[in-house]
Amino acid sequence: MTKPTKDDELYREMCRVVGKVVLEMRDLGQEPKYIVIAGVLRTALANQRIQRSALEKQAMETVINALARS
């Protein structure tokens, strides 16, 4: 079995943060549109009171940038 690369770790973290947002939106009865997901992630990333790992921050920024290009 090969060791996961940094890209693999980033991709898994991106999937985790997007999945979390989508499930939370579903629980609130909201439709998870890509522009709304990006907005939720921007707001969460701007919250300085929550400590995040460097990987989580990078994943959130990468997802925001990818969704902004859509």
Swiss-Prot record:
It holds the Pfam family DUF2767. InterPro entries: FumD. It catalyses: (S)-malate = fumarate + H2O. Keywords: Lyase. GO terms for molecular function: fumarate hydratase activity. Its EC number is 4.2.1.2. This is Fumarase D. It comes from Salmonella typhimurium (strain LT2 / SGSC1412 / ATCC 700720). The lineage of its organism: Bacteria, Pseudomonadati, Pseudomonadota, Gammaproteobacteria, Enterobacterales. The gene is fumD.
